[in-house]
């Protein structure tokens, strides 16, 4: 809840010239905020894949200073205006720094499971195996909606187990997910392990999800969007993970 409030506060920053542009948007807005409080600051782009080598020469980028909102944390804010093809970025260094996706990866893991009919939009039920987990919400049967809402790790690990490592890796490569490195343990490759992705790559993938540039079944795309919908009104829809 505290993290959610921080994200909302950053996204609603009210510098007039910035908000004037935000209020004029009618297209889908994509935001990705990664707080990297325990990640070391890297002053130059590394050649070892730790940074996304983004060719921004042809991009329309506005740099915003949101350091007041981050406080003692090091991190980034990346917003892409789909209608105007324009970026607003706080801290380019961290915006290209690849880190573990952790629960944000569940968006795509769910999509892979849907594409392979492990789960379907109509039936995404997976039974709890009876193992005791540290969060009460995890100790129950789950659907995609409940598993996404409570960020239930075992649900997505179960999807992976049914998919198999080879199929998961094929999908990771197909959509170009970050460094595409699944060399870590198969049960946790996306949790502080080998798979890493930068905030800018996260936003690029969210744009592809919105436009279904993947060419996946529209009903599967919509099922994932529904599962990560936080609120919706006449003003727009807010998604998050």
Language model features by range: what are they?
Residues 97-100, 133-138, 185-197:
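A glycine-rich, coil/turn loop motif that links secondary-structure elements
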Residues 115-131, 217-221:
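Short, well-structured active-site flanking segments
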Residues 99-123, 147, 202:
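Active-site SXXK
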Residues 143-144, 156-210:
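Mid-domain, small-residue-enriched loop/turn segments at the edges of structured enzyme/sensor domains
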Residues 124-140, 146-152, 163-164:
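Acidic helix-start/capping segments at beta-turn-to-alpha-helix junctions
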Residues 2-61:
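Cytosolic-facing loops and C-terminal tails of multi-pass membrane proteins
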Residues 46-95:
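Beta-lactamase-like hydrolase cores
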Residues 230-241:
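Short, Gly/Ser/Thr-enriched beta-strand-loop segments that form substrate-interacting elements
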């Amino acid at each position: 809840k505290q993290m959610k409030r921080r994200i909302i506060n950053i996204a609603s920053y009210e510098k007039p010239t910035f908000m004037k542009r935000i209020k004029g948007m009618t297209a889908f807005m994509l935001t990705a905020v990664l707080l990297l409080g325990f990640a070391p600051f890297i002053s130059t782009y590394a050649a070892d894949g730790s940074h996304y080598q983004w060719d921004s020469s042809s991009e329309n980028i506005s740099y915003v200073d949101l350091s007041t909102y981050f406080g003692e944390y090091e991190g980034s804010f990346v917003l892409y205006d789909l209608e105007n093809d324009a970026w607003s970025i706080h801290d380019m260094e961290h915006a290209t720094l690849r880190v573990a996706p952790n629960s944000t990866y569940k968006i795509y893991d769910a999509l892979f499971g849907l594409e392979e009919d492990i789960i379907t939009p109509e039936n995404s039920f997976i039974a709890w195996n009876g193992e005791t987990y540290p969060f009460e919400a995890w100790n129950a049967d789950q659907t995609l909606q409940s598993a996404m809402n409570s960020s239930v790790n075992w649900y997505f690990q179960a999807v992976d187990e049914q998919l198999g490592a080879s199929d998961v890796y094929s999908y990771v490569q197909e959509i170009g997910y970050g460094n595409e490195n699944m060399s870590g343990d198969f049960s946790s490759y996306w949790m502080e392990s080998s798979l890493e992705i930068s905030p800018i790559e996260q936003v690029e993938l969210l744009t592809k999800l919105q436009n279904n540039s993947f060419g996946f079944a529209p009903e599967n795309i919509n099922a994932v969007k529904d599962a990560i919908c936080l609120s919706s009104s006449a003003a727009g829809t807010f998604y998050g993970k």
